[in-house]
């Protein structure tokens, strides 16, 4: 997608400039020049009605002092009727038409198939729209030719998303620079993940700011990230809900999430939150929450070394998340490109976490393919769904080299990594069966969420600590889970400890992910005393069954 040059077609009576015939999912700017002084409370809205009679209401934003710009992106080819409403009499209730031409764009993205994404366009029927593979990187503070080179390098590596910060002031020069970045990214068919931070000021100032952002940016191919790390903001839940209410005015309904230091799962059930974000390098958090929330997720991967980056990339993937990287080393970009190529050759939009493996973590589409990450090289055992002819290959996550192995005709794979010098990825698949599934354009099977076992009598562990009914507000608190009975599945239990002060409404925070350890009551979740901490402990066993226990503790000041 690209920014079009404005056609010099002016209607003097209205001071109006239209855009030329515009390819679908490309920018169409319609400008209105206002003579004299324009009142601060001036409003101009445009209702676009497409060939299929779907309508979009778009606000104008102010630019160049006395200019109003309506920025739109048509989603289908053909004539679009435009009707204006405005506080300015010369524009109110005026009508005209623009034209959209067909393009090869697949459109915006949207959540699909529980934990994945698809495009909104690119096919005549919604059910036939292509899947979207999220591969993200984060834009550093650069400009000019350096910016162009950076974007080009990401496109070559297969990156499909670029994360960037939106200015938190209504500064026209800053937003002009943002427009340049957005145009470069979208031109390479990459989505811009826009991180939103509120300006200083009251609610009225925030509303004015976010309306400006939506009017100026929503016609681009974007997603919205509310706050960078919500946990750092006081009364974060109210602030997130407020900003989300402004985003409800996005006429294109781009996906949104909340930026998190640890997890935005606390907002997963909120209106409009369409995917989750993880900022913690601890893959256990997303592994457990993938079994709880029927929404896709991305992990922000920040690592000091390239090796650490690669391990986190693949571990987070096996937890069911897509990568949103912060590459600070050329090797990191190489590893991200290897990841992209590996998944582009799979039915990635149908893969879900797979647990029946020894010395590895996996994803699978039953009866079709398995992708297993072996972090510690050595022997690996994979119990497959049925005795079929399976193709087997090893992928080197450092350079993408593929080593083909002997075909397998069994329901179990027993083998070892090609060498023990680094981590490996094992790909087991049925080539002929995968080819046959091409007639299923998106979903070849129903995907259901499991029911979490909450019956204490059936949960294979208990809360051993904290002991007693009260915990301190400021001191370290020990926590521990104790297995009631040990089995092969329970020996590999993954725990997630969360705490919430329900009365104060901030939602839960992660307290720990180990069998035992210590935590401090997060300050941001307690506003009033006396207070009660609602603790919940999840246990995900080695076969993928999820359990939970709850217990309340008074918080002593």
Regions inferred by a protein language model and the residue ranges of each:
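Aromatic- and carboxylate-lined catalytic core of secreted/periplasmic carbohydrate-active enzymes
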Residues: 16-21, 38-43, 295-299, 305-406, ...
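Short, solvent-exposed loop/linker segments at the N-terminal edge
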Residues: 19-25, 36-39, 469-476
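Active-site mouth of glycoside hydrolases
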Residues: 43, 89, 103-275
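Extended acidic/polar, glycine-enriched regions
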Residues: 56-114
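Short beta-strand segments within Ig-like beta-sandwich modules, predominantly Fibronectin type-III
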Residues: 60-62, 406-408, 509-516
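Short, solvent-exposed loop/turn segments at the edges of extracellular beta-sandwich modules
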Residues: 87-89, 539-545
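Extracellular glycoside hydrolase catalytic/binding regions
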Residues: 222, 228-334
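Surface-exposed, flexible coil segments in extracellular/virion-facing regions
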Residues: 500-520
């Amino acid at each position: 997608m690209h920014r079009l040059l404005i056609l010099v077609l002016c209607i003097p009576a209205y001071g109006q400039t239209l855009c030329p015939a515009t390819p679908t999912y490309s920018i169409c700017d319609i400008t209105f020049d206002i003579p004299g002084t324009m009142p601060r409370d001036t409003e101009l809205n445009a209702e676009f009605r497409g060939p299929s009679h779907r309508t979009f209401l778009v606000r104008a934003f102010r630019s160049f002092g006395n200019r109003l710009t309506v920025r739109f992106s048509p989603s289908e080819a053909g004539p679009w009727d435009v009707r204006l409403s405005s506080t300015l009499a010369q524009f109110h209730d005026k009508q005209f038409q623009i034209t959209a031409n067909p393009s090869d764009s697949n459109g915006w993205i949207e959540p699909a198939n529980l934990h994945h994404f698809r495009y909104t366009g690119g096919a005549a029927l919604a059910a036939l729209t292509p899947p979207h593979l999220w591969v993200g990187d984060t834009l550093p503070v650069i400009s000019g030719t350096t910016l162009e080179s950076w974007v080009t390098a990401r496109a070559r590596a297969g990156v499909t998303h670029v994360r960037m910060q939106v200015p938190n002031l209504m500064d026209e020069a800053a937003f002009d620079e943002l427009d340049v970045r957005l145009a470069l990214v979208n031109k390479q068919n990459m989505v811009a993940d826009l991180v939103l931070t509120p300006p200083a000021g009251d609610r009225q100032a925030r509303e004015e700011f976010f309306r400006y952002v939506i009017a100026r940016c929503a016609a681009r191919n974007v997603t919205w990230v509310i706050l960078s790390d919500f946990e750092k903001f006081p009364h974060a839940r109210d602030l997130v809900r407020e900003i989300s209410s402004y985003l409800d005015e996005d006429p294109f309904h781009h996906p949104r999430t909340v930026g998190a230091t640890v997890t935005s799962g606390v907002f997963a059930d909120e209106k409009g939150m369409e995917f989750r974000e993880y900022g913690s390098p601890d893959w256990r958090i997303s592994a457990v929450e993938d079994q709880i929330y029927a929404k896709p997720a991305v992990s922000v991967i920040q690592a000091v070394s390239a090796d650490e980056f690669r391990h986190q990339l693949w571990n987070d993937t096996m937890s069911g998340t897509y990568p949103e990287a912060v590459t600070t080393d050329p090797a990191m970009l190489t590893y991200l490109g290897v990841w992209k190529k590996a998944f582009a050759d799979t039915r990635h939009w149908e893969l879900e976490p797979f647990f029946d493996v020894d010395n590895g973590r996996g994803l699978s589409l039953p009866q079709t393919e398995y992708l297993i990450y072996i972090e510690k090289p050595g022997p690996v055992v994979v119990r497959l769904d049925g005795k079929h002819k399976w193709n087997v290959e090893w992928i080197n996550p450092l350079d993408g080299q593929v080593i083909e192995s002997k075909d397998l005709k069994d329901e179990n794979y027993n083998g070892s990594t090609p060498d023990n010098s680094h981590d490996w990825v094992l790909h087991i698949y049925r080539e002929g069966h995968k080819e046959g599934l091409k007639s299923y354009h998106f979903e070849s099977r129903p995907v259901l969420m499991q029911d979490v076992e909450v019956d204490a009598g059936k949960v294979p562990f208990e809360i051993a600590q904290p002991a007693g009914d009260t915990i301190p507000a400021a001191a370290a608190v020990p926590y521990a889970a104790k297995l009631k009975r040990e089995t092969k599945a329970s020996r590999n239990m993954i725990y997630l400890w969360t705490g919430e002060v329900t009365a104060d409404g901030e939602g839960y925070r992660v307290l720990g992910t180990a069998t035992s350890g210590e935590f401090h009551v997060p300050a941001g979740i307690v506003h009033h005393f006396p207070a009660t901490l609602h603790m919940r402990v999840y246990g995900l066993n080695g076969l993928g069954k999820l359990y939970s226990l709850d217990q309340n503790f008074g918080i002593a000041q």
